[in-house]
Curated annotation (Swiss-Prot):
Active-site residues annotated for this sequence: E318
Keywords: Cobalamin biosynthesis, Glycosyltransferase, Transferase
Function: Catalyzes the synthesis of alpha-ribazole-5'-phosphate from nicotinate mononucleotide (NAMN) and 5,6-dimethylbenzimidazole (DMB).
UniProt catalytic activity: 5,6-dimethylbenzimidazole + nicotinate beta-D-ribonucleotide = alpha-ribazole 5'-phosphate + nicotinate + H(+)
Disulfide pattern: none
Any Pfam family: DBI_PRT
Pathway where this protein functions: Nucleoside biosynthesis; alpha-ribazole biosynthesis; alpha-ribazole from 5,6-dimethylbenzimidazole: step 1/2
EC number: 2.4.2.21
Domain of life, per lineage: Bacteria
Signal peptide: none
Protein name, entry field: Nicotinate-nucleotide--dimethylbenzimidazole phosphoribosyltransferase
Family as reported in the entry's similarity comment: Belongs to the CobT family.
GO terms assigned for molecular function: nicotinate-nucleotide-dimethylbenzimidazole phosphoribosyltransferase activity
Organism (species): Chloroflexus aggregans (strain MD-66 / DSM 9485)
């Protein structure tokens, strides 16, 4: 049995008993019931995910998957492909936005080379799991084989398992890869059935002509390959990316281990859609970190029926929105765990009518 199949088979429902106990405790805390709004619901959700009435999230980490895309040769990005390895080195030096924000919230940054189209120097903080030097140009041929797509997902599962085995109890998804919004738009259009123009944005800031070219490239690719929207592996293989597959694996791995996983932006959203086609129950373990201004992100949340915690007009990726949302997950759990109940504090409860 493959690692992917084993992992999917281990994804079960939320723990209703833990969630019910958490809700009961929320109602006993020294505040009007519901007065902390979505923080209360978030803590109850995390209780159901972890199976603990009073979950404590003390070791967060963001897994940043990096890979290149053959479709970049079609002029769909404002930046050249060599930016991918350059940014990976920036991550390793601690100089990127994800590093700054992760330090702010106390999260570990795990950088994974799953498909960068360059040989990166060895570094103690680099997880080298390169499967290929980027994908093929999916405007001409499938992005990768079905076998390679499964390998990408299994790399992500392994990375999630390794992080959880080291004590990580809250995961977030992040990525780097020039032209990966093109692949993400293709994945989202294929799975949701939305028109390509409706789920395709400017990515790194392309002009009108480049946006029109990007849309046309994706439309032609979907006609050429006819990805099956009910088969996440087929969609990933035909129009996806190695880092998208890796992140789908991170999500599945977290779900199988009952660890909450905070979904970042548009590319992570595409990975979440792939994970959901493979294991619908995995959606229960996803927390939507933020709403990206990248146009297709709303379609992702509509399909998954998730409501993002933050809406800050961000569109960087890397996991930046997700790590900010991690602090809300931790805050929600701290309120549930550390606040006194009415009985403990000697505070009178609300009078019954």
């Amino acid at each position: 049995m493959s690692l992917l199949t084993q992992t999917i088979n281990h994804i079960g429902p939320l723990d209703d008993q833990a969630a019910t106990a958490a809700r009961r405790r929320q109602d006993m805390l020294t505040k009007p019931a519901g007065s902390l709004g979505r923080l209360e619901e978030l803590s109850i959700r995390i209780a159901g995910i972890t199976g603990r009435e009073r979950p404590r999230l003390t070791k967060p980490a963001v897994i940043v998957m990096a890979a290149d895309h053959g479709v970049a040769r079609q002029g769909v990005s404002a930046f050249p492909a060599e930016v991918t390895p350059q940014m990976v080195l920036n991550f390793l030096r601690g100089g990127a936005a994800i590093n700054v924000l992760a330090r702010h919230v106390g999260a570990q940054v795990i950088v994974v080379d799953i498909g960068v189209a360059a040989d990166l120097p060895s570094h103690p903080e680099l997880v080298s799991r390169k499967l290929a030097y980027g994908t093929a140009d999916f405007s001409q041929e499938p992005a990768m084989s079905r076998d390679l797509a499964q390998q990408a997902i299994e790399v992500g599962i392994t990375c999630a398992n390794e992080a959880i085995d080291s004590g990580v109890d809250l995961l977030a998804t992040g990525e780097m890869g020039i032209a990966n919004t093109t692949a993400a738009s293709a994945v989202v259009a294929a799975i949701t059935g939305r028109p390509v123009a409706e789920v395709t944005g400017r990515g790194t800031g392309i002009d009108d002509a480049s946006l029109a070219r990007k849309i046309a490239v994706i439309e032609r690719a979907l006609v050429l390959h006819q990805p099956n929207p009910r088969d996440g592996l087929d969609v990933l293989a035909k129009v996806g990316g190695l880092e998208i597959g890796g992140l789908a694996g991170v999500i599945l791995g977290a779900a199988a281990r009952r660890v909450p996983v905070v979904i970042d932006g548009f590319i992570s959203g595409a990975a979440a859609l792939i994970a959901a086609t493979l294991a619908p129950a995995a959606v229960n373990y996803m927390i939507a970190g933020h709403r990206s201004v990248e146009r297709g992100h709303a379609a992702v949340f509509d399909r998954l029926d998730l409501k993002p915690l933050l809406d800050l007009d961000m569109r960087l990726g890397e996991g930046t929105g997700a790590v900010l949302a991690m602090s809300l997950c931790q805050a929600a759990c701290k309120v549930l765990d550390e606040m006194a109940t009415f009985a403990e504090a000697g505070v009178s409860e609300k009078k019954e009518a």
